[in-house]
Amino acid sequence: MPPCCWSLPPSPPSVWLLVCFTAPTKVPARLPGQSMFGGLKLNNLFAKEAISPMIINVAFQGTRTGITVFMAAFALEELGIANIGVFATAASLMGWVARPALGILLDKKGPIATLIPAGLFFSAGLLCLAFAQDLTWFIISGILIGIGQNGISPVLMTISMRTVPAERKAAANSTNYLGMDIGSALASTVGGVLCAVFGYRVGFAAFVVPVVLAVALAVVILSRLEKQERTA
C-alpha cells in the first residue's frame, strides 16, 4: 500500500469514548491557600428569592409522583386492570401533540393565560382517575394530564428564573429542582396514608387540592412579577 494511503485500524467506540474523557483540559489555577471547594456555598446552591416557586413545585411534583406510585395498584386492586401503561402512553402522546400549541399560547398570551387552563386540565385528569371505571377513563385521564403537565411545568420554570437576577439563574434552577425532589419524597408518604385510610379514589381526588393551590399561588407570583417589571 502506498505511504499516502495508510489508515488507522478500526477501533471500538469505547476507545474513542475513553479518549474524549481523558483528553487534557485547561483547569483554572487556584490561588495559594484557596480550597478547591471554596465556591461551594449555600448561597450559590440555593436561591431564597425562588422559595415561592419551590413551594409550588413541591405541590405539583408531589401530585405527579403520587399518580405514578399509586395508579397501577389502584387499577389492579379495584378494577382488575393489569396493564395500565396505556395511561402513560396517552399522556406522553398528548403532551407531544399539545406542546407546540402550549408554547404558542405562552408566547402570545403569557404565562398566566397558559397556567390556568393547564391547571384545569390537570385537575380534570385527576378527577377522571378518582371516578375511573374502566380503561377508557385512564386514557381520558392520561390525555388531560398530558396537556396539563406540559402547560404547567414550563411556566413554573419561568417563574423560578424571573425571581432572580441573571447571575443567580443556576441557583434558582437548583432551588426549583429541590422543590421537585421534596415533593416526590412527601407524595409517597402522604399519598400512602391517604390511600390507606380513605382509599385510592379519595386519594386521587385529594391531589386536586395541591394542584389548585399551586396554580393559584403561581398566578399571584406572576401578577406581582409583571407589575414589578412594568413599574421598573
Segments (PLM) and residue ranges:
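Intracellular juxtamembrane helix-capping segments at the cytosolic ends
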Residues: 151-164
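A membrane-interface helix-boundary motif in multi-pass transporters
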Residues: 1-10, 193-211
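Short amphipathic helix-loop junctions that connect adjacent transmembrane helices
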Residues: 69-83
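Helix-to-loop junctions at the C-terminal end of transmembrane segments
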Residues: 98-110, 195-196
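C-terminal membrane-cytosol helix-exit motif in multi-pass small-molecule transporters
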Residues: 4, 9-29, 217-222
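Juxtamembrane intracellular "pre-TM" segments in multi-pass secondary transporters
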Residues: 22-57
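Conserved extracellular-gate-facing transmembrane-helix segments in secondary transporters
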Residues: 56-68
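Structural signature of the two symmetry-related core transmembrane helices
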Residues: 9, 113-128, 208
